[in-house]
């Protein structure tokens, strides 16, 4: 799947938004990818996951024992990646502000895991999820995401395979360009709201 085909899937789902957005990282952006909209169609979600699975090297795929994703945004993407790879898919969640495996999910000691995200901006949620997998006894050997919007700066500590890289400028709240500052900010993501 080419980058243009991936973007066409987002456009068809009305998931590529323009405006002033507060990202889960706290950074601001003029564009937002609402992955929940692109993933709400099971056939589209499967196509995107299968295209991403194709990008992961076979030498890594054969080592994997499961897929783990962070709730909330990564749950559907992780489930579809599990289907594409023929692996169980689990998720970590933050009942107390810190990611944990719950709901009876467990990893065998040393089990090799693919961390699956919907979007990576700073990599903070991914690193927190990797820590939770390690604390549960697993070993994340690679990460994947539908979209890398980090401008190449996210360091997850493991090989990272995005379906598409979108270089959309992000800004600190105190360093907004005037045209963005003039638009009221909205927070469409899944992490708790940050002070504006």
UniProtKB/Swiss-Prot annotation:
Its cofactor is Mg(2+). HAMAP family: PyrE (MF_01208). Belongs to the purine/pyrimidine phosphoribosyltransferase family. PyrE subfamily. This is Orotate phosphoribosyltransferase. Homodimer. Gene3D superfamilies: 3.40.50.2020. GO terms for molecular function: magnesium ion binding; orotate phosphoribosyltransferase activity. It catalyses: orotidine 5'-phosphate + diphosphate = orotate + 5-phospho-alpha-D-ribose 1-diphosphate. Keywords: Glycosyltransferase, Magnesium, Pyrimidine biosynthesis, Transferase. 5-phospho-alpha-D-ribose 1-diphosphate binds at residues 117-125. Its EC number is 2.4.2.10. Pathway: Pyrimidine metabolism; UMP biosynthesis via de novo pathway; UMP from orotate: step 1/2.
